[in-house]
Amino acid sequence: MEKREELYRGKAKSVYKTDDADRLILLFRNDTSAFDGKRIEQLDRKGMVNNKFNAFIMQKLEEAGIPTQFDKLLGDNECLVKKLDMIPVECVVRNYAAGSLVKRLGIEEGTRLNPYTFELFLKDDAKGDPFINESHVVAFGWGTAEQLARMKELSIKVNDVLTKLFDDAGLLLVDFKLEFGVFHGEIVLGDEFSPDGCRLWDKDTRKKMDKDRFRQGLGDVIEAYEEVANRLGVPL
């Protein structure tokens, strides 16, 4: 597989073309951002940890019958993925109240949500990733009703699989965001799954083990990521 020119540079990953029109290479960088990219710092080992963490999670999801863009690891910081036609919508599943839900509704952080909630946000940093609903997605042509239904179905299945996986490792899966795209007509899970895009708390102490450590200035960000990886058995 030949790596070619950079196609896109995000806040924490770079995407490269390959000599296969259906495949891309993701490069996980050490860049760490918060507040829609307004604060960016370099954290040693972050790219490596997130790349291998993502590979581990995506393989677990594939084993559970959830289609993902992940193909294989190429090195410490790179992986090969399917080229998706991305849908510009973030799907957020919440099992406990945290983050923007607490701010929007005044709910106490850590409140158990039973059942979970499912939310949609437009993927647009310039607009602050605004909260949207299904009718917006269809009306503005970001996706179809059928695609949305499949995205929700897969998001709930991801929650079922990962809630147990993290629980077995002594962690609460507080919430997470997913992005989806289309590959040869099929809705497929894209982007990544790492502590950058979910909230994970220690089950006993409620210690935060995710990017909130960076957002809130708690320190030991990568140490927390590595502890989560070690608890799951991710080979780093």
Swiss-Prot record:
Gene Ontology biological process terms, A to Z: 'de novo' IMP biosynthetic process; cobalamin biosynthetic process
Q: Which InterPro entries match?
A: SAICAR_synt/ADE2_N (IPR028923), SAICAR_synt_PurC (IPR033934), SAICAR_synth (IPR001636), SAICAR_synthetase (IPR050089), SAICAR_synthetase_CS (IPR018236)
Q: Could you tell me the superkingdom of the organism this chain comes from?
A: Bacteria
Q: Which UniProt keywords apply?
A: ATP-binding, Ligase, Nucleotide-binding, Purine biosynthesis
This protein's pathway reads:
Purine metabolism; IMP biosynthesis via de novo pathway; 5-amino-1-(5-phospho-D-ribosyl)imidazole-4-carboxamide from 5-amino-1-(5-phospho-D-ribosyl)imidazole-4-carboxylate: step 1/2
| One Gene Ontology molecular-function label | ATP binding
* Catalytic activity entry: 5-amino-1-(5-phospho-D-ribosyl)imidazole-4-carboxylate + L-aspartate + ATP = (2S)-2-[5-amino-1-(5-phospho-beta-D-ribosyl)imidazole-4-carboxamido]succinate + ADP + phosphate + 2 H(+)
| Annotated EC | 6.3.2.6
Q: Gene3D superfamilies annotated for this entry?
A: ATP-grasp fold, B domain, Phosphorylase Kinase, domain 1
Alphabetical GO CC annotations of the entry are: cytosol
**Record's family?**
Belongs to the SAICAR synthetase family.
NCBIfam families referenced in this protein's UniProt entry, alphabetically: purC
User: What protein does this entry describe?
Assistant: Phosphoribosylaminoimidazole-succinocarboxamide synthase
- Per the UniProt entry, what species is this protein from, by scientific name? Pseudomonas syringae pv. syringae (strain B728a)
In the UniProt record, the gene name given for this protein reads: purC
